[in-house]
C-alpha cells in the first residue's frame, strides 16, 4: 500500500516489471560461466565443429539489450562457428550453406547434396550439452532454430542458436547466418538491434530502456498482443524524431498517443532483412489502437490528478492502465 502516485509507480516497477538486481547478477555470472564451457567444446567433444576465434559467443535478445521483464525465463546466445571455406547461396525464401570437402567436422552434418543441415547442427549442440556441469536437460526449441539448455541450479534456460558470420560484402557489411527452422538458414544481425537500443537509450539519458520494459509489461497483459520484438521497435521508432526527454509519465502518455495511430503504420526491421515487422491483421490493430487510446486518457488524468495532490485518484487511473499489480492507495 502506498500514499503517492510516485511511490506507487516506483513500487510497481521494482516489484512487477524490472528484473531483480541480485537475480540479474547471478544470471550474468551463469551466462559467462556457460560461455566458458561452450568455448571448450571443440577440444572436449568428438567431431564438434571449430568455433570462430574471438567471436565464439554472441549475446542477443532482450536480456542482452536490458529490456527483459519479469520473470527471467530465458537468456539467448549465439554459438558462432568457423565456416572453414563454406559459402552461401541466397534464395528468396532461404539461404543454403555449401560445405567444402575438406571441412571434415561440418561435413558430418550435411545433406546428401553437401549443404549444411541447420537442424543437424542444432542436434549436435544438443547432444554435446550433457557434459556441462549441473546439466538437467536439453531440447530442440519448438521453432527448430535453437537448442534450449536447462541447468539444475537456475530457474532460467539458455536458448543456444548456432551461427556463422559472412565475409563483408562490397559495402563493408557482414551478417550472421542462423537456422530458419526448416533445415536451411537465414540472415540476421543482432549487433544492429543492440546498437540501436543502446544509442537511443543514451540519447535520452538512460531512460528509454525502462520505458520499453514497462510497455512490454503492459503488452503481456493484453488480450490482443504485439510481439515483443515489434513492440520494442515501435517504442524506438517513437523516439526516432524526438530530441529531449519529458519525464517517464509524460513519455508514457506520449507513447500511447503515438501508438493509437502508429499501430496502423509500417514499422520496418532496422536490420533491413525482414521488411515490415507490423504484419498484424486489421482487427488486432484496431483493438490495440482502442486500448492505447484508453491508456492515453487514463495517464493524462493520472498526471492531472497528481498535479492537484489527488494521489488516490491518480493511482486508480494508473491501475486502469497496468492492472491489479499496480499498488493500491493507502488511506
From Swiss-Prot:
Keyword Repressor recorded: no
What the entry lists under InterPro entries is as follows: NT_sf
EC number from the UniProt entry: 2.7.7.-
Under what conditions is it induced? Answer: Part of the CBASS operon consisting of cdnD-IK1_05631.
Gene3D superfamilies on file: 3.30.460.90
Q: Which UniProt keywords apply?
A: Antiviral defense, ATP-binding, Nucleotide metabolism, Nucleotide-binding, Nucleotidyltransferase, Transferase
What is the top-level taxon of the source organism?
A: Bacteria
| GO process annotations (BP) | defense response to virus; nucleotide metabolic process
EC main class here is transferase
A GO molecular function term, named singly, is: nucleotidyltransferase activity
**Protein family:** Belongs to the CD-NTase family. D12 subfamily.
What job does the chain carry out? Answer: Cyclic nucleotide synthase (second messenger synthase) of a CBASS antivirus system. CBASS (cyclic oligonucleotide-based antiphage signaling system) provides immunity against bacteriophage. The CD-NTase protein synthesizes cyclic nucleotides in response to infection; these serve as specific second messenger signals. The signals activate a diverse range of effectors, leading to bacterial cell death and thus abortive phage infection. A type I-B CBASS system.
Q: Can you say what this protein is called? A: Probable cyclic nucleotide synthase IK1_05630
Q: List the source organism.
A: Bacillus cereus (strain VD146)
Lineage in the entry?
Answer: Bacteria, Bacillati, Bacillota, Bacilli, Bacillales
State the gene name recorded for this protein: cdnD
